[in-house]
Structure formats: structure tokens, C-alpha cells
């Protein structure tokens, strides 16, 4: 499943032009990444993790097509229940088994959705920190 068009269309030249005059904030940069890429949902709500079937995705999970994360795959995205589909936060995971850390973007995630995501990462050898975007 993909979310394209409008805010989530693929407009990298538009993103470059919008920020050509100077530095951007963390949140503006995330808005630009999400706005300039298509969200591909490859693990829909209710699906099981491919390597750990005991883990069930209670929210849609996917990636930004055409982007690259630390694991050389697309930047991961959690899609929450807020229909406005705006960047609402970011999280960092630390996995001591894989010896890695990753950034994931939260789109449309409410406080309740963030609690669900925290539970998903609650394992003995991993840690998660969620940074919620303050409302203007």
C-alpha cells in the first residue's frame, strides 16, 4: 500500500527550492522528507514481524520510498490514527543484538499511538526514545 499525491507526492526539486535560502529546523527537515517521498506501507496494522512472528504491528508501518536510512533501506515510518497525516514525532531505537541505532518518523501518531509503539520496542536488549513534536 502506498500514500501518494498531495502532501506525500514526490517533489524533490520543490523541497530543495523551499529551503534554498538557509538552514531548516529539525521538524521542517522531517516535513520535507515526508512531503518529498511516497510512504510505502509494507507492514499493515495487524501483520506479524517477518523475523519475529510474536510481534504484531498494531499500527501501519512502512518506509519513505527513495530515501536511505542507517540500515541502507528506506527511512522507516510509523503511521498513527490521526487522519491529518502530519509529522508528529520521531524516535530512535537502539538494538543491542544487531548493534545498531535507527531513526524512525512518526506520522499522524497520537499519544496513545506512541504508547503502542513503545510497547512494540519493549524487549530486554533494545531501547527506544520518542521525541514528540510540540503543537504550535
Question: Could you tell me what each predicted segment is?
Answer:
Residues 4-136:
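Hydrophobic N-terminal alpha-helices or hydrophobic patches in metabolic proteins across all domains
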Amino acid at each position: 500500500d502506498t500514500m501518494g499525491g498531495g502532501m506525500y507526492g514526490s517533489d524533490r526539486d520543490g523541497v530543495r527550492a523551499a529551503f534554498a535560502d538557509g538552514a531548516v529546523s529539525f521538524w521542517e527537515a522531517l516535513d520535507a522528507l515526508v512531503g518529498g517521498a511516497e510512504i510505502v506501507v509494507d507492514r499493515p496494522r495487524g501483520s506479524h514481524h517477518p523475523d519475529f512472528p510474536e510481534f504484531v504491528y498494531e499500527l501501519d508501518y512502512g518506509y519513505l520510498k527513495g530515501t536511505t536510512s542507517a540500515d541502507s533501506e528506506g527511512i522507516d515510518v510509523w503511521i498513527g490514527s490521526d487522519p491529518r497525516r502530519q509529522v508528529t514525532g520521531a524516535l530512535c531505537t537502539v538494538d543491542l543484538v544487531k548493534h545498531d541505532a535507527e531513526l524512525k518518523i512518526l506520522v499522524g501518531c497520537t499519544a496513545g499511538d506512541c504508547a503502542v509503539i513503545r510497547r512494540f520496542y519493549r524487549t530486554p536488549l533494545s531501547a527506544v526514545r520518542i521525541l514528540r513534536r510540540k503543537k504550535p
